[in-house]
Amino acid sequence: MAVYVEDHPLIKHKLGLMRQKDISTKDFRDLASEVAGLLTYEATQDMETEVATIDGWAGPVQVERIKGKKITIVPILRAGLGMMDGVINLIPSAKVSVVGFYRDEKTLQPVQYYVKTASAMDERIALILDPMLATGGTLLATIELLKASGCTRIKGLFLVAAPEGIEKIQKAHPDVDIYVAAIDERLNEVGYILPGLGDAGDKIFGTK
């Protein structure tokens, strides 16, 4: 498993804006989408291309096109939806697979309440979207769900991550790559990332 911390100046700047306590819903939502797009650019650099000949304005011309497995983006409800547009803007043909989990208050384990995956998952590369990789429990459940559906190439895109969550995924699924704008210091006693972004879902949907 590789962990890619994207240290591009634009990502650093935009993430810094997102950390502001009094940021508006619109600004947080827009920035989440923009950073997701930048992460997508990095996460797709290893995609293979093939040469094709097309009719150009001055006659036949050779161009390169992406080949191989098709992409499905997998936003984790609900906050992952806030990153979806940034990815679709770059990969408009991507199919969308959606998963939803809630946390059992007694066991603190993720419980699946919704799943709808694209067809032919064994032929796709999955890009999981979630603003926060905290304890890693929800991501772990999502990866296992995708693998059970036949998907073998999985990547995760996150705005911020905690070392604890990354370590959990590295141990359980070393074949899954992680792309993140920043790795923060730690989790607090209730599982929030510090310094983090706060509740990303509330900030994206304006329910804070």
Curated annotation (Swiss-Prot):
Alphabetic keyword roster: Allosteric enzyme, Glycosyltransferase, GTP-binding, Magnesium, Nucleotide-binding, Transferase
Pathway it works in: Pyrimidine metabolism; UMP biosynthesis via salvage pathway; UMP from uracil: step 1/1
Reaction equation(s) it catalyzes: UMP + diphosphate = 5-phospho-alpha-D-ribose 1-diphosphate + uracil
One Gene Ontology MF term: uracil phosphoribosyltransferase activity
Cofactor field: Mg(2+)
Origin superkingdom: Bacteria
Biological process terms in GO annotation: UMP salvage; uracil salvage
InterPro entries associated with the record: PRibTrfase_dom, PRTase-like, Upp_B, UPRTase/APRTase, Ura_phspho_trans
Positions contributing to uracil binding: 193, 198-200
Residues that, per the record, bind 5-phospho-alpha-D-ribose 1-diphosphate: 78, 103, 130-138, 199
Cofactor detail note: Binds 1 Mg(2+) ion per subunit. The magnesium is bound as Mg-PRPP.
Family label: Belongs to the UPRTase family.
NCBIfam families, A to Z: PRK00129.1, upp
Role this protein plays: Catalyzes the conversion of uracil and 5-phospho-alpha-D-ribose 1-diphosphate (PRPP) to UMP and diphosphate.
HAMAP family found in the cross-reference section: Upp_B (MF_01218_B)
UniProt name for this protein: Uracil phosphoribosyltransferase
Organism: Desulforapulum autotrophicum (strain ATCC 43914 / DSM 3382 / VKM B-1955 / HRM2) (Desulfobacterium autotrophicum)
Organismal lineage: Bacteria, Pseudomonadati, Thermodesulfobacteriota, Desulfobacteria, Desulfobacterales
Gene name of this polypeptide: upp
